[in-house]
């Protein structure tokens, strides 16, 4: 109450939650065809948007998620773009628009459409290999973004058309839809913008997973991306980051 805002923090989840190291797997016996582990090929190639004219083909089912320029430095964004290309994977612009060098170094690149529309440019969207509609992220599901003023440099401010050095907040909801019917219209609008050449992906923070995924699927995206609560954030309310969401 003295600060007049949430107590903010960034980076990874601090509490201990289950990880992929805790997974166990059910082996095949009678009900599932058994394969020879040393002779059968393991295929990691992943295709996003096979219905599109230009689907995204990843060598591995992992890609660099959207992190904004501001939350990350120019050097970090471009280094991740180079690394993803070397790994046969993809990157995502995150909030705030396109860095030309990130696009140049990324062989496969998603352009993110976020609630605030900061830096969103339809011409840049047409340069992307895929469009990601940001609906939420795992560490602060149902909440908007917050970029601390000390990270809002002159270059970041110019890209977002906002003053430098001042905290920038993003709304929790997109301004042009109120429900799933409007989301379906937004997906169709982005298809028309990109002439149905590239995949449209929805990014959801994991919450009511079964119901949310069913509703998202009815909007006819090419892929649905669920973000777990350990997915980290540049800045978010500590109480929400520590105590809400579902482990990924």
Say what each PLM segment does.
Residues 1-62, 66, 71-85, 89-90, ...:
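Conserved, well-structured core domains of diverse proteins
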Residues 91-94, 111, 133, 202, ...:
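General beta-strand structural signal in soluble alpha/beta enzymes
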Residues 74, 78, 87, 154-197:
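Internal alpha/beta core interface subdomains
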């Amino acid at each position: 109450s003295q600060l007049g805002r949430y107590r903010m923090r960034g980076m990874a989840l601090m509490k201990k939650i289950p990880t992929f190291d805790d997974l166990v797997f059910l082996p095949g016996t009678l009900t599932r065809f058994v394969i020879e582990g040393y002779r059968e090929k393991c295929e990691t190639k992943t295709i996003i948007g096979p219905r599109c004219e230009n689907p995204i083909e990843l060598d591995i089912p992992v890609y660099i998620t959207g992190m904004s320029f501001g939350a990350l430095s120019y050097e970090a964004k471009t280094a991740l773009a180079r690394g993803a290309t070397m790994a046969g994977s993809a990157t995502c612009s995150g909030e705030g628009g396109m860095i030309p060098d990130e696009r140049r170094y990324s062989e496969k690149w998603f352009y993110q459409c976020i609630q605030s529309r900061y830096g969103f440019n339809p011409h840049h969207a047409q340069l992307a290999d895929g469009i990601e509609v940001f609906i939420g992220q795992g560490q602060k599901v149902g909440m908007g973004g917050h970029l601390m003023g000390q990270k809002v440099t002159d270059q970041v401010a110019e890209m977002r058309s906002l003053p430098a050095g001042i905290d920038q907040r993003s709304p929790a909801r997109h301004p042009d839809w109120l429900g799933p019917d409007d989301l379906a219209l937004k997906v169709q609008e982005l298809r028309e913008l990109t002439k149905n050449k590239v995949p449209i992906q929805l990014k959801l923070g994991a919450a009511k997973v079964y119901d949310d995924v069913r509703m998202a699927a009815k909007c006819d995206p090419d892929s649905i991306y669920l973000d777990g609560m350990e997915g980290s954030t540049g800045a978010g309310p500590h109480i929400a980051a520590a105590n809400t969401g579902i482990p990924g």
